[in-house]
Amino acid sequence: IGSKYDSANIESGTSKLTPYSTVTDKIKSASCTYKTIGDIVIVSATVKMNAVSLAGNSMCPLIDLPYKCISEDNVFCVGISNLGKLFKFAIPKNNTWLQFSTQDKTAYTFADGEQINVICLYKIK
């Protein structure tokens, strides 16, 4: 475990994010890297999609973030795909889920292998 911390006591690591059972056919893979700095974690996630459509009001939940979000409110971040589409990401309070939908709430069809990147910060202590 000592190799996960640097001299400033900042923990770094990687984590595989698991698509929730209702969206396993939509997501090819999902993972993240993270750093903890005091009571905050910075998560940089990458989601690779299959060639599927997402309805305008649909959410794609991923589970297994490295730390539970203990913020008083849900945390929101914006992600972008390699094709330029924007996505709204949310981490519900008291949870280890990262979920996303299209930012403009319109339906969207992903290209096979389209990649979404997002960086979120949230409170863990």
Regions found by a protein language model. Name each.
Residues S31-T36, F87-K93:
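Short, exposed beta-strand/loop patches in secreted or surface proteins that constitute
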Residues I1-S29, S71, E114, L121-K125:
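Glycine-rich, low-complexity segments
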Residues K26-N82, I119-C120:
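Beta-rich globular "head" domains
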Residues V52-N57, F89, T109-D112:
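A short, polar/proline- and glycine-enriched secondary-structure boundary/capping micro-motif
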Residues P19-K26, A30, S58, Q99-T102, ...:
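Nucleic-acid endonuclease domains
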Residues P92-K125:
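Surface-exposed interaction regions enriched in Ser/Thr/Asp/Glu
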Residues G2-S3, N50, D64, F89-P92, ...:
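Beta-strand-rich, repetitive solenoid scaffolds
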